Every structure is written in structure tokens, then in C-alpha cells.
């Protein structure tokens, strides 16, 4: 039988044994990829500086997902927090990767077995002797088992009853660690940034899945519903499965891009909206003002700002700054962050403090403008000499650093002031090592951006796949030329002239 590549799946339509086989092989491929990718990432990951060179700056994709579920130690002797691993045990990064590869091998062998021994008695209808699958019952079994798994994850793993818990952090991504989480059963459980909602929703959804599974195992669908939804067709199962997958892909794309308790910024990097809204900038200013109110000097106040918080307030960590087709990790763009130079404070010759207007997300270049506290432009870096009345030279702008490596230093040289004004457009100023990775200076996206882009694309593709296969299975008889009124046309006595719908209809 010569089939084109896009029709080869038809060979498993009436072959339950080999249908199981191809699903086992698919799961083997997914599991094998996950384990292999994890081992690759472990081999290239540098755990030495979790503050300025975290996993998301290095382009790690699998490691953040392992970490948020409670894996923090490596057999290599390191931990995700930069400390020395004491007792990693079997559930280390390498242990989980190995488990996935072993599972992949077992699934591969199971797939080969089911492909070879496809004609099992189990798959034959005892009444007809033909191959058949009780799809409503199989649906109930899947619901029941997935409900048990969902409940177990929420009730045991997340809560720490039997498991490590999950990654929990503060809104500013400073205190993250793996810890047990108590379920939130009130309205706060619907807060997407509340980790307690993860536990309670998995418990509730798991109970619902178990009950729904038992219902479908015990109750048979009516004949009208069975045929109306084509419950006997494997293509119906394909269509509804694709619907579940594309919906899940859309949801996780949203929680990843907009941020949630399940996508902490310490593991996946900040969101673009945290830059757009000045989220970290406001927190830094709040902390500085609080220190000043306690009597600290400007230098001391800025020195108290965690380097981690300052690094978040840098546009290069914005996932929307990297183009979709710029391959590579963030470190391949602006380089490996070495240290915070400190907060740059600009002043004109009249003593007014000036603030550099920050670059919006979707700009590659932006005019360098220095505004006073009232928002009035007092200085800039002009494009032409004819427009230079606000130039750094004429206004006499100086820059002083507080905190960081340049703490207490003041620069008045116009060329140096311009250099730091351009850097201040991008947020807090950091020194980068661009030679180690031969970084090209062009921003890249973080795993948050790649995950979102990939899942939105696949969700759209699967959405059309759902429509396609759903239409094929529901309107199969119509596509085959069998219309709804075909029985009326061929039934004797319905029309005065058999098969002629234009003739008068007999009254009954």
C-alpha cells in the first residue's frame, strides 16, 4: 500500500495493538529527548555565579523545569544556589535525566513488543470477533488515572507530605528556594502569583478527574450522543485530544509570558512587563529612600541594594528585547555579567539631579535624554552639532556612582559622561565579559521568550488540527455523500415518487 507521508497514520486506524505501539514510541522519544537534553545542559552549565550568571542567562531550557519541581543538587558537587552539594541522592539533575533515559528505553522495547504482537485477544469484540476498542471506557480509564496523578502531585509532592515541595520566591526573585506549600482554599487560591493555588487546584482537579473517570467507567453514553459525537471513531479521540493539548499550550504560554507562581523569575528570567512598568526600579528606589530615612548616606543606601535586584533592572534581561530569530543564550548577546558598576546619578552645573530616560522595550536605538524631576529636558546627546544647545558639554553634566564597583567616583569628562548616559538608558549599569563567549552585543531572548513563542506556534497549529479532524469525524457521512435526508429519499411511501424530493410528501 503506497501512502503519501501525510497519510501514513491511517495504518493504525483499525489496529489497536499498533496504535498503542506508536503512542509508546512517541512517549519514548519525548522522554529520551528530555533526559538527553538535561544531560547536555548539565555538561555546559556554569553554576559558579547564580546571581549574575543564572541558568536563564545561559539559555538553559530543561533545568528550570527540573528545579521548580524540587531538584537543586548535582552529582558534580554543586547546587543551584552556588553552594556545595552535601547529599544529592538519586533525585539529582543527573539522576532525573538518567531516569528519563531508562524510561525511554523501556518504552521503546514495549513499543516494539506491541508492534510485533499486535493481534491480541484483548482487542477483539467477543460478539463480532473483529478488532474494536471501547473508546468511552478507555476515556474513563485515562481520566481516572490522570486524576489520581494530578491529585497525588498536589496533595503529596507540592505540600511536602511525600516530596520536596516546589520552588517558591518573593515577587522580586530574591529569596527563592524549594519548600513545601500549603494549599490555598480561599479566593487567594485564584491569585496566579500565589503558589498555594498550585497545590489546591491540583487537588481539586484531581478529585474531579477521579470522579469523572469513575462516571465514564460506570455510565454508558446514550445511543443518540454516541453517534452524534462519533464516539466510536478513533479520529474523534484524536480531535478531542488535540483540543486538550492546544488549550493547555495556550494557557502555559500565557502563564510563562505574563508570569505566575509556576514560572519564577529566578529560573526563567524576568518578564517584559516588569521592565515596561519599572517594577524593579520602583522597588530599588523604595529601598534607597527607606535607607536614607534611617540616616544612611547615598553611598550606603545604594550599597545595600542586592546585586541580584539591580541586575533584574537591566533591559538586556527583558525577554522581548531578543529577536525571535536570534539564536543563542542571553550571554551570547551582551556577554557574561561580571559586576555592577553602581547607580549612576547625573547632575548639571546648577546642581539639578538629572534622570536618563530609559529605552522602551521595542526600540533598538533611542535618543539619550536627561530630564529633571519635573520631566523637563535639561541635557541630551544631540545627533547634530546644530542641535547642541542641550549637549553634555554645554550643560556641564557630571556623573557620580553610588554603590557597586565605582562607588563614590565622579566623572566630569564629557566623553565619559556620555558613555555612562548611554548605558543608563538600559537600566542599571553592569560590566560584561564579551570575549569568553565571543558575544556579538546583540540582545537575545531568555527561555521565557522561547517557551512562549514555541507554545503559541504549536497551539495555533494544533487548533487547526482540532478543527480539521473534528470536522472530518463529525461530517464523515456528509463528506462520503450521505446526506441527513438520505433515508427519507429511499424509504418507500415518504414521497409520491420514490427518491424525488420535489414531489409532494405523504402525510402520516
Curated annotation (Swiss-Prot):
UniProt organism field: Chlamydomonas reinhardtii (Chlamydomonas smithii)
Stated family: Belongs to the PsbB/PsbC family. PsbB subfamily.
HAMAP family for the chain: PSII_PsbB_CP47 (MF_01495)
Record protein name field: Photosystem II CP47 reaction center protein
Entry membrane topology: Multi-pass membrane protein
Protein role: One of the components of the core complex of photosystem II (PSII). It binds chlorophyll and helps catalyze the primary light-induced photochemical processes of PSII. PSII is a light-driven water:plastoquinone oxidoreductase, using light energy to abstract electrons from H(2)O, generating O(2) and a proton gradient subsequently used for ATP formation.
Gene responsible for this protein: psbB
SUPFAM superfamilies given in the database record: Photosystem II antenna protein-like
One GO BP: photosynthetic electron transport in photosystem II
